[in-house]
């Protein structure tokens, strides 16, 4: 009869073999080349920015000049590009347009993101079956979208690609888990071939599950995009505690605030930075101590004049914290 230790070792070996088999099943597509028409041109060279430089998340479509100009007018030097509006329309002409606008307004694009194609239901009832790379029905289409995003980002010299990977199972024996490992392995390899990191945005999964995914994919190009509010909005973790688990893997950050969910069907409420549950002084201090080199990109999910007013307030709030950290 096997001892308990032998049984645990056998189970661990079986799980590793299962993960390897699932990963190899799709890894062959990971090195797919970019469209020749897009990648034949010279890549735009992004300037360097200071560690923890403030930035703004923008959705450039349909008017990229207005959005990039706004970044400059609000006093930011970096931006995080949400590019869903351009899926299936990434072209050399678009690269040239974006490169010209970034140069014109002296803005550095730090990270590119897509989450589409639809459907995407941002709640607890339908989110698990619609968001990210976990749901089988949408996985391949989203892998294709992420590869498009990666190739376009490469043409602009952007070194990070990010998305929500979805409600990754807490149970590594769930059949969806190794399939998700394989999918994340595939897109991570594609990004690595483009000289980029692939970042899993925090939110739908616990920090421990995200750490397990990092270890199971086992590729240095895989990292974390920390969204401070999402951890709270989805009820998964306090961002301070999440950094204790994921801190060394964080390569991008959304500065966003929110409150814990009190309705089991709906996410918590996003609020202006400084009015929610995120302890920004502690989070930013921890990132500083970890040697974080990325930007601090404000994300405010309102729109119009109210969004601009909110962002101005949030910028001042974060600048005050960052100045204290730098001058300590």
Report the location of each language-model feature.
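Active-site acidic/histidine proton-transfer and metal-coordination neighborhood
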Residues: 22-35, 41-46, 62-66, 104, ...
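Active-site beta-loop-alpha junctions enriched in small/polar residues
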Residues: 57-61, 84-86, 114-117, 166-168, ...
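Histidine-acidic metal/acid-base catalytic patches
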Residues: 2-33, 37-53, 64-72, 207-222, ...
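Acidic (Asp/Glu)-rich catalytic clusters
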Residues: 47, 68-75, 90-112, 150-157, ...
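Charged helix-capping and loop-helix junction motifs
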Residues: 93-97, 176-184, 236-242, 276-279
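Hydrophobic faces of well-ordered beta-strands that scaffold small-molecule active sites
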Residues: 52-58, 79-81, 109-114, 161-163, ...
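Short, flexible, mixed-charge acidic loops at enzyme active sites
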Residues: 71, 117-129, 261-265
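Glycine-rich, proline-tolerant flexible connector loops at the mouths of alpha/beta enzymes
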Residues: 82-103, 165-172
């Amino acid at each position: 009869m096997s001892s308990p230790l032998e049984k645990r070792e056998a189970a661990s070996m079986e799980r590793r073999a299962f993960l390897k088999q699932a990963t190899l099943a799709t890894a062959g597509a990971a090195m797919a080349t970019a469209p020749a028409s897009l990648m034949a041109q010279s890549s735009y060279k992004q300037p360097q920015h200071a560690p923890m430089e403030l930035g703004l998340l923008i959705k450039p479509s349909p008017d990229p000049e207005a959005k990039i100009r706004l970044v400059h007018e609000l006093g930011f030097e970096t931006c995080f590009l949400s590019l869903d509006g351009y899926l299936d329309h990434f072209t050399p002409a678009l690269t040239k347009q974006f490169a010209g606008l970034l140069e014109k307004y002296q803005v550095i694009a730090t990270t590119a993101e897509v989450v589409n194609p639809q459907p995407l239901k941002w709640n607890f009832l339908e989110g698990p079956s619609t968001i990210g790379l976990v749901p089988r029905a949408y996985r391949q289409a989203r892998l294709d979208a992420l590869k498009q995003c990666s190739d376009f980002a490469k043409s602009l010299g952007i070194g990070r690609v990010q998305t929500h990977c979805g409600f990754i199972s807490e149970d590594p024996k769930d059949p969806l888990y190794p399939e998700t490992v394989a999918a994340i392995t595939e897109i991570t390899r594609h990004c690595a071939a483009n000289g980029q990191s692939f970042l899993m945005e925090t939110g739908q999964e616990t920090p421990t599950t995200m750490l397990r995914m990092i270890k199971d994919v086992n590729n240095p190009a895989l990292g974390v995009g920390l969204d401070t509010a999402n951890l709270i909005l989805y009820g998964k973790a306090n961002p301070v505690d999440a950094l204790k688990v994921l801190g060394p893997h964080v390569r991008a950050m959304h500065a966003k605030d929110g409150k814990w969910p009190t309705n089991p069907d709906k996410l918590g409420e996003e609020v202006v930075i400084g009015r929610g549950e995120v302890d920004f002084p502690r989070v930013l201090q921890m990132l500083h101590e970890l040697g974080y080199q990325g930007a601090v990109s404000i994300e405010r999910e309102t729109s119009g004049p109210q969004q601009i007013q909110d962002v101005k307030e949030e910028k001042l709030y974060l600048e005050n914290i960052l100045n204290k950290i730098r001058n300590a």
